[in-house]
Amino acid sequence: MLLKSIQNIVCGLVPTFFLFGSAAAELDFEQWHPAGLGDLRCGCPAMNSLANHGFINHNGSNITVNEVIPLMQEVFHLSEELATIVTGLAVLSADDPASGIFNLDMLNRHNIFEHDASLTRKDFYLGGDGHTIDQPTLDEFLSYFDGKEWIDLNDAAAARYARVLDSREKNPSFLYQDQQLITSYGETIKYFRTMVDPRSNKTSAEFVRILFTEERLPVREGWQRPREEISGFSLASDVVQLALRTPEKFIGMPFDQRPFAEQAFDPLPWQRPPIWTPPNYPGFSKRHFSELVGRFAKKALPFRA
């Protein structure tokens, strides 16, 4: 349903994007100015970096689908299909998605583009606003790369999952179902792949630090546009690899369903069986059954997320 909404909105807007042409030769990465008073920003460092470099309106307002899609292709080497999906998710946060126009601060609306367990922002419940970098959160995220010149997918997985655990512990309204889970995995893969060295399949820790702290593309330090196109298929494949490096047993599962061992054993949401309702025996309630199975699951599972 979500992808269908994106398709319906964006397909009517993208024909004119071909008029944009190839912008790579015209983009001046040396031009960079951080957000000033009154400038609008969101929780996505990639989007914010486009504004800080002046590739989209520096004030963060009146951004169009027709300009963002080709920029995603030219700057980050996303495929047309993936650039359209990412931009479509952004425009869904707009007051009028069908217009194809949005402001960056609209992306801060909770649980559309923005989500709990951000890599650098506080959860809304904990006082976050979606766009302001929270220094303790940023420090925790970057601490997983301390002392390393290069980071691999294991490092990226550990840093991401630490944020999930932290939010789960501190935020009683923490929401981490399939939409938030896929968004969380996807954003980690996107920064990892756009900064990766194809020879080693590792990413410069310095590039990641600059992107997340300054919201700047680290061209001065040697970053270049990825050589290989990042497609929806390659993103999905990398998401699976990231998931396999993450000790989540209840990934994407609503908390009230987690006592059931049948679902607890499934590591990924697309491998989950349908929700099973236990038999209704007189004097033996669903709560009793849940407690019984929960005790069994605790003994049967060596660890649980």
Curated annotation (Swiss-Prot):
Heme binds at C44. GO terms for biological process: sterigmatocystin biosynthetic process. Keywords: Heme, Iron, Manganese, Metal-binding, Oxidoreductase, Peroxidase, Signal, Virulence. Induction: The genes forming the sterigmatocystin biosynthesis cluster are co-regulated and induced on oatmeal porridge or the fungal isolates were grown either on oatmeal porridge or in YEC medium (0.2% yeast extract, 5.0% corn steep liquor). Expression is positively regulated by the cluster-specific transcription factor aflR that binds the palindromic sequence 5'-TCG(N5)CGA-3'found in the promoter. GO terms for molecular function: metal ion binding; peroxidase activity. Residues 1-25 form the signal peptide. The keyword Manganese applies. The keyword Signal applies. It holds the Pfam family Peroxidase_2. InterPro entries: Chloroperoxidase, Chloroperoxidase-like_sf. Its EC number is 1.11.1.-. Pathway: Mycotoxin biosynthesis; sterigmatocystin biosynthesis. Binds 1 heme b (iron(II)-protoporphyrin IX) group per subunit. Mn(2+) binds at E114, H115, S118. Its cofactor is heme b; Mn(2+). Peroxidase; part of the gene cluster that mediates the biosynthesis of sterigmatocystin (ST), a polyketide-derived furanocoumarin which is part of the most toxic and carcinogenic compounds among the known mycotoxins. The first step in the biosynthesis of sterigmatocystin is the production of hexanoate by the fatty acid synthase (FAS) units stcJ and stcK. The polyketide backbone is assembled by the non-reducing polyketide synthase stcA by condensation of the starter hexanoyl-CoA and 7 malonyl-CoA extender units followed by cyclization and release of norsolorinic acid. Belongs to the chloroperoxidase family. This is Peroxidase stcC. It comes from Emericella nidulans (strain FGSC A4 / ATCC 38163 / CBS 112.46 / NRRL 194 / M139). The gene is stcC.
